[in-house]
Amino acid sequence: MEHRFNDDSLSLHTDLYQINMAETYWRDGIHEKKAVFELFFRKLPFDNGFAVFAGLEKAIEYLSDFSFTESDLAYLKDELGYKSDFIDYLSGLSFTGTLHSMREGEIVFANEPIMRIEATLVEAQLIETALLNIVNFQTLIATKAARIKGIIENETALEFGTRRAHEMDAAMWGARAALIGGFQATSNVRAGKRFNIPVSGTHAHALVQAYRDEYTAFKKYAETHTDCVFLVDTYDTVRSGIPNAIKVAKEFGDKINFIGVRLDSGDLAYLSKKARTMLDEAGFHDAKVIASSDLDEHTIMNLKAQGAKIDVWGVGTKLITAFDQPALGAVYKLVSIEENGKMNDTIKISSNPEKVTTPGRKRVYRIINQLNHHSEGDYIALEEEDVHSEDKLKMFHPVHTFISKFVTNFVAKDLHVPIFEQGKLVYDNPDIQTIQAYVQDSLGLFWEEYKRISKPEEYPVDLSQKCWDNKMQFIHDVKNKIKKELYESE
């Protein structure tokens, strides 16, 4: 089937209302106003104690290439009815703004700005949907992977979710996010090529079925592959699968690298113990027992509690789909806008207290105790505040303000780094291995109580006094303005 508009520009990866708002701004002449938006989420996923930020590399690619193609413009004009003068304006648009962001792999928490975008009102508005799409998905997968890796610890974790992912790009970028979260390899060959990450795979039940019996299938596989992992549960794991894997491994000897056996069904606790015993008795003490079959952190924790002898964990569906929480819920809110040549803060008020935004351009600092090298909490301050010059900080809960403490002898780590400055890319995103190491190093700053899988302690994310006062003043002013308008209308 032929399509008239057959290219696939990511600049149209947006909601229609973003373009509608862009046209409103442009026709009203306010499109060049400077605006500051912040991207954050309100609630940690999976009831976890932290999240792992992922998606910066994709965001960099998106912003670097942001422009409307001739096909985009033709579609907007011919199919959606936008007028020629607005189309002409869009034809010259690119991202000329500034992006400050947390590093990819940063440990992040609810209500702290992960990204801060400073651009013209039109540019900042048009990129909202794509940035949220990128960060919402990849951060969710990286966080799920980190939860699983936290249970597996030093054992190997493999990402096996490609066929169950929501589509091809989700599989590829999800594989990358899983490695950021701590996984060692993926089965996705495209992701391996695209991101230069390790790939790993065995064979399917179809191989055994094609040859009708396990011995022949394993033998043929060994004849064509040096590294061998045999899938042993096609017929009978204990009486047929494992014995035939051992038989082929002995026959081929040093001609192959017998990595181990994979279990993909049945009672994994029982079967892994049987497999370990049978492999050891056959002299294959270094052979690994690899398990898959709808695993997640909860199943893995239960298997470990039952004494399962599993060395390598292949996790697919429940990782790549973020099975128990398929959405992160990140939002993108305007916090400051230019008026009469001056930046003025802005706030969104809601009857839901958690949806009231914090006005102003802000930075996030991690307050690290220099004596025990653990984090005391994250501290959100207005851009103009010089936190590094402070010898003593008052940290207090932004809602329950009576919960407070004073911190001395600390280092304030600025979590934001410049990515784009006035449209120019100024940041070199590190490779996966470096990001992965950064995640693990960063997790070392937190007490175990914040990292446990079930009912973790709430990590402090506090506002500076100046930031909090600014927010309270805005709430007060908005309420008074509404009261005045109601009074005058009566």
Q: What are the functions of these language-model segments?
A:
Residues 99-105, 410-415:
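Short acidic, Pro/Gly- and aromatic-enriched capping/linker segments at domain boundaries
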Residues 200, 261, 289, 311-313:
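Hydrophobic residues within beta-strands of alpha/beta enzymes
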Residues 2-34, 43-45, 81, 87-96, ...:
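Buried, small/hydrophobic-residue-enriched core segments of structured protein domains
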Residues 74-75, 143-147, 161, 451-458:
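Short coil/turn segments at secondary-structure boundaries
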Residues 2-33, 46-48, 282, 295-490:
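Gly/Ser/Thr/Ala-enriched C-terminal appendages of enzymes
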Residues 35-91:
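N-terminal, Lys/Arg-enriched amphipathic/low-complexity engagement segments
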Residues 61-66, 101-104, 108:
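An N-terminal, globular interaction/scaffold subdomain
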